[in-house]
């Protein structure tokens, strides 16, 4: 099996450790991994801001970059949902690119979805002794319907005590450009999220979308809260029995 890594903008620029963790995970699974260098932004920021033609240019570049990939795996439910749902919307009426968009969507997987539903991982052997909560991101849980897969994997991590997070599926207030355009509302939403995290007395927040982690983690730092923030890939890669 050969897998191509779709790294995403946030991992490339802000969370390189997440990309490295995905590589470690795939190596542990015995999966051959490559990195198509032609990949770029999936186009979601442009699409959500109304710049349809710019989004199409990004989508076409992504389609070309992963044209020959058997599987495409990304550590982002948000970017995966863009490829799955909105590429097809953008290219409706364009038979050539619509078919290519469908072909790309059919081969693109969010990381935990791939590990559980393609590789069938049910005996993950890593260790992390922490009391934690898991934040369900909007695009991943609603757009892709991926809810149990990350929790199933985290339940296999030795020493990890996952507490139930109240209102775990409530938006953290990031929403891409929403956090910029509606900053006061976004701030209220993330403060509410932090209140629920603190109520669990957890010292670790785990998520599967880096936009959420950047938003919540940044707010935690500004409020001087001693709560660590990790991507699910980082947790799975910690203490691997290599």
UniProtKB/Swiss-Prot annotation:
InterPro entries: Cys_rich_dom (IPR004017), LutA (IPR022822)
Annotated Gene Ontology cellular component terms: cytosol
Name of the featured protein: Lactate utilization protein A 2
Family: Belongs to the LutA/YkgE family.
Biological process annotations from GO: lactate metabolic process
Transmembrane feature ranges: none
An example Gene Ontology molecular-function term: oxidoreductase activity
Function per UniProt: Is involved in L-lactate degradation and allows cells to grow with lactate as the sole carbon source.
PANTHER family registered for this protein in UniProt: LACTATE UTILIZATION PROTEIN A (PTHR30296:SF0), UNCHARACTERIZED PROTEIN YKGE (PTHR30296)
